[in-house]
């Protein structure tokens, strides 16, 4: 198992407790430089530590990938992972959704892809969803415009009363059920 994520000692112990024969290689942060070079700045700045530039040589990183049969990854990921990990059979991604993998070469390949759907903090995302509903229902975008303009135009507000309304939640997975 090759971990491209920074994992804690507790997480390492949990993985190795599954089977003592598991060889776990911790390469968390090793590929950050490559990720920074291949993803837009807004992505790498948000998801990578500011001083993360990777570790090891290109040859060492290529060797790690070439030998990996199972990879634990995250977001953002290496776009050319399948091409470089010829023995790869299984890629597990920590984020819940897999559609973000469309950009890379894993999508549509022979590699089994799994995600951590259901093990994240879905309640926090559901609360952000409710906050978004309230944001627009109460006219907060107009309030921002008024604040910038330095005046309040009460006629521009059309707040919506949410009480008694019915909402349709499409795709009621873990987050949708919490909403």
Question: Where would I find each of the regions flagged by the language model?
Answer:
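Phosphate/diphosphate ligand-binding glycine-rich loop within oxidoreductases
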Residues: 66-145, 156-160, 175
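Generic structural signal for helix capping and beta-alpha/helix-loop junctions
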Residues: 32-34, 100, 123, 150, ...
């Amino acid at each position: 198992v090759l971990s491209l994520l920074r994992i804690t000692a507790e997480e390492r112990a949990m993985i190795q407790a599954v089977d003592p024969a598991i060889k776990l290689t911790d390469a968390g942060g090793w590929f950050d430089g490559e990720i920074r070079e291949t993803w837009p700045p807004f992505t790498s700045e948000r998801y990578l530590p500011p001083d993360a530039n990777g570790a090891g040589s290109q040859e060492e990183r290529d060797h790690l990938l070439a030998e990996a049969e199972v990879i634990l990854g995250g977001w953002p990921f290496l776009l050319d992972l399948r091409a470089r990990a010829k023995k790869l059979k299984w890629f597990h991604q920590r984020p819940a959704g897999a559609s973000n993998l469309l950009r890379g070469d894993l999508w549509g390949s022979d590699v089994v892809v799994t995600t951590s759907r259901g093990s994240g903090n879905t309640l926090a995302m559901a609360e952000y969803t409710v906050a978004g509903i309230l944001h627009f229902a109460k006219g907060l975008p107009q309030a921002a415009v008024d604040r910038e303009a330095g005046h309040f135009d009460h006629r521009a507000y059309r707040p919506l009363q949410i009480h008694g309304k019915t909402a349709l939640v499409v795709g009621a997975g873990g987050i949708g059920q919490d909403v």
